[in-house]
Amino acid sequence: MPSRVSPGIVNVTDFVAAHAKKFGSYINYIDREEAIRIDHFDQQNILSVDGYNHYMENPKKSSGIFTDQYDHLTPTQRVELKKQFTVAQKHQSVMWQSVFSFRNDFLAENNVYNPKTKQLDEAKLRDATRVAMNDFTGKMGMTHSAIWSAAIHRNTDNIHIHVAIVEPQPTREWKRVTVEGKHGETYQEWQRKGYVPKKILNHFKAAFANEMVDRDRSLARISDLIRQRLQPDQRSAWRHQSSLD
């Protein structure tokens, strides 16, 4: 049986309610130094495995937090971000977390990562994250209510982007859920809905991938296909038209 080839990019998304311990931990570490944040990553992360079913370990290196507006946050901006996440928790917002994971050869093929020099085009990954988040919040109806923060994490063998999303002024509907207590007892409480439809998740991943894939290489491939399908006399006309464009 032939071995299954894993995709070049995978995404896993989940959510927790406002009272979840890891929601509070994420907030507590927002304004801490990056070395401290990655040392305590497991206390903030709600995703046990990435899309390749690899255990989500503490990253060896992190780019630091970025957002929709800023590539790198100043200490003052970190404090402000922490305040917004705190308000979201106080108002019973859901916290979604999403991870994009990559195969290194896929990143190399798309000129995002150089395996020899270990250089990573973080700007391209940030741009792709912003495009994907714009798609996600739009389709979830949270364009004007959601805020998010993200960081690029690097381990020995893989690179991934970890994103956290909240609503300081929540718009999600309430639902009654059964919760298990500390001693195994169960009870019901009201929580905001955090479910994300599969169709939205598929668009989310596609938006990221489409932004990240090397456009020059894609355009070259399209041009090759056009040339292959045209008759010889049509090719010269097509080249002439292209030069005019």
Task: Label the predicted regions.
Residues 1-159, 163-245:
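N-terminal nicking endonuclease/strand-transfer module with a His-rich metal-binding environment
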